[in-house]
Amino acid sequence: MNHTGMTVSTEIFSMRTSFCGHIKKSMLSSLGSLSFRSQRVQGNMTPGTDGTTIDGFSRKQISQLIELLKWERYQPKPVRRTYIPKKNGKMRPLGIPAFADKLVQEVVRQILEAIYEPIFSDNSHGFRPNRSCHTALYQIKSTCRGTNWVIEGDITGCFDHIDHEILLKILSKKIDDGRFLELIRKFLKAGYLEFNQKYNSLSGTPQGGIISPILANIYLHEFDKFMEGISAEYTKGKQRRPYREYQILQYKRNRAKKKGNQEQADEYLRQMQNIPALDPMDKNYQRVKYVRYADDFVVCIIGSKATANEIKERIAGFMQKELHLELSREKTKITNLSDKRVRFLGYEITKSQENTKQVVDSIGRKKRSVNGTIQLVVPGDVIREKLKPFIKKGKPYQVGARVNLPVIEIISQYNAEIRGLYNYYCLATDVSTKISTFQYYHYFSMIKTIARKEKSSVKKVIQKYGIDVPRKNGTGTMRIVGIRYNTKEGPKTMTYFNDSLKKVSRPAGEISDQFGQVLKGGQLMKRLNSDVCELCGAEHCALEIHHVRKLKDIVKKYRKRGTPMPNWVWLMSYMKRKTLVLCHDCHVNLHNGTL
């Protein structure tokens, strides 16, 4: 497909027939995609203003949606506004769209991604396929060596203050189809409902909308291009000038070697190895690097504070004039990286205080770097905060809310926590030290939780559930609390997290969520297209999707009652799926409890 913008939009939207064919195919795929998301995110089963969810959605409703789009009569409903707590105790507004609007937005997102992903900046990492917080952090670590000053960017209420007309103007540069642009305008202007009162959307991307992240990236792509221009403009000098002190020592060492005084020559060499060969304060050498993740960005500068201040003012001016956004004067800081750490995406960024460091260049040659190797570290307050639920008076403590869970679920929950923490901070220089500290308290909190559940002691839990596993260094075994259980594939073992905590040098190649969603979506689409009710076997009938939040909760409910599971529960449990494709009669009877 040609990604020049005009060609893409014309191919998709020039004729009603091709438009509808593409939309129908995309909607069926997107229905599966949204089903897969709702299996992972409980909030996706929350009804919007029309009370609908994926449960009960059918191909007939998709056809009705397509007709509305075909004749330009589709109108998104206002989102239902709710509030969720933030870490600082305040509440953050969240919008919940109607399910039909989610479906249309998913199709729009796919089209926008096909047009814009090939042209997005390499400095942008948020909400993009194969990019993440890790790729943003790795870019800083690998390209910002020698940084003196860092601008920590903070855009005041970025997503809430995106100007609709500017956004549509930006979109029109790449998309020449008025119908598609009008569809996006409708989403932008849909408004929201709060306490049964409708409010208009005057600015910002659709709250809770699937298209919001990519629309924000398209908007801020203008800023990305501006910063690429700034970087090129402020780049000065091919390399730093030689460091005077280093040259003097090099001259003295050469003279000592000529005189045959090897001991003195070695001493000069040791002194040379402790200072840079090139002048880190060379005023004729300047670099500006920029990295953005969503609305968070940093600008790393090799240069003077005056240069940093000048760039900050130019950023503020561009934001205000071109994007109608405000750079927070209070929160946007200029930090001297030699004196203070910078917080970005949950990590702390610091600069090595060693004068020199041996590094390997792009073709594998060893060489000394100028001082200032960038290091990523785990903030100490993150570990303290994460430990709060698991300690009391400085000692490991049980989690009361987990006492009534089966032992295997207790272990599974603890494993998910430490694995998630390590996976996020695996790029940090001190990840092993920091996570090991967390691991000690976390592990014994798990043991104490199991002990309280079984009215036992730590010692007895270790005796009962201890499993010998190989040590990480390969020398012998060690005992870790875990559990053995049976599956259809045979016996299996789950122990507390025992993976290596070593630092990861660079992010692994990440597969985007869309990859998994397409696979899962295709399965659901095939089931819908089969024209067979999965419960009664009726053929060639209108089919609907039944969806549950948590399959295990449904199964557990019948087991607690001691009553046989209905056929539909047994079938979902057997297929290990949270969805069933049913005829209308079966779906109604299921909800009425008569199946």
Regions found by a protein language model. Name each.
Residues 1-595:
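Non-catalytic terminal/accessory segments
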